[in-house]
């Protein structure tokens, strides 16, 4: 599906199943629930938005300088490899399951609720100029084999980190 520099605007709930989605500089949005499944997603400088729950399943997603967000509900992501460099992922609650997350200068944020990351390898910045932010309005739950961070990891309430290898040079 090619939505490069385009607009797909659903007035109701919207399901999109495609092999490949090019949403580079595009806008894919739903006034209700958005359910997106694709092997590869290019959301570079694009927007994937839902007023209600946003569910995204993908093997590879490039969200460089892009936005993936739900205004009034949750974002549930199952992505094998996520590039969120200078990108933003936000919702009331955010859940991410995957194998690799690169979050250089990116932000993943639950506005008022929980941020749950179950990712094998998390890179939240490897230098001060590439520091990312993982921010939970309430509870932060991270389960990972490896977590490298020069960025901010913040919980408004409790933080539960289950990590086998931690390199943290930023704020925790």
Outline where the language-model segments fall.
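Surface-exposed loop/turn motifs in large extracellular/passenger domains
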Residues: 10-18, 32-38, 50-58, 71-80, ...
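Short, T/G/N/S-enriched strand-turn elements that build extracellular solenoid repeat scaffolds
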Residues: 3-9, 23-29, 42-49, 63-69, ...
